[in-house]
């Protein structure tokens, strides 16, 4: 069994971990990097794995630094389920389309300003359509229900009163 830290290792944003066994590949969170321009640029890099090879995503909560790259993941080939609690799923249904609007607005503003100064145009990280399509992957899992993926890989969402 291998656990790879893909984000939130040298920074507090971009939470994402890849759990791999011979039988399964699970992504734990798929968060957006936030902060300086250099940190945010990490969102535009290719994933360090093939999204089509991921069997499922376990989403711990709906903060954008934990779920913000799920639309990009799905657009880039992920076909599996995103496991999340009801509350997390409901919040992600608000957060991800809102994030897409922000991505589109930021790109439009950058490109309008950049046209005058000669900057290279940028594209939004993902679109509203990408965010909406990603939400179709969500599968609600009740708190305290064990998800069994293989004989050796199981997960349970516990209720946290400290952090959403």
Regions found by a protein language model. Give the residues of each.
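Short acidic-hydrophobic, aromatic-tinged amphipathic segments that line or gate anion-handling sites
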Residues: 139-143
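Conserved small/polar residues in nucleotide/adenosyl-binding loops
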Residues: 162-164
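Short beta-strand scaffold segments in enzyme catalytic cores
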Residues: 14-19
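Extreme N-terminal starter segment of soluble prokaryotic enzymes
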Residues: 1-2
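Short strand-coil-strand connectors
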Residues: 20-22, 149-151
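Feature recognizes metal-dependent phosphohydrolase scaffolds
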Residues: 5-7
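Pre-active-site segment of Zn-dependent metallo-hydrolases
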Residues: 22-80, 84-88, 95-133
């Amino acid at each position: 069994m291998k656990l790879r830290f893909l984000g939130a290792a040298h920074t507090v944003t971009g939470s994402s971990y890849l759990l791999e066994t011979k039988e399964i590949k699970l992504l734990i969170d798929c968060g957006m990097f936030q902060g300086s321009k250099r940190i945010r640029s990490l969102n535009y890099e290719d994933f360090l794995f093939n999204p089509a090879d991921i069997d499922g995503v376990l989403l711990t909560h709906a903060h954008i630094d934990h779920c913000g790259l799920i639309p990009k993941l799905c657009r880039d080939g992920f076909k599996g389920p995103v496991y999340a609690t009801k509350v997390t799923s409901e919040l992600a249904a608000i957060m991800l389309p809102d994030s897409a609007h922000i991505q589109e607005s930021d790109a439009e503003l950058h490109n309008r300003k950049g046209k005058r100064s000669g900057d290279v145009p940028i594209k939004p990280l993902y679109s509203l359509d990408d965010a909406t399509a990603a939400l179709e992957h969500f599968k609600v899992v009740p708190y305290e229900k064990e998800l069994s993926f293989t004989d050796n890989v199981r997960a349970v969402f516990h209720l946290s009163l400290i952090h959403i």
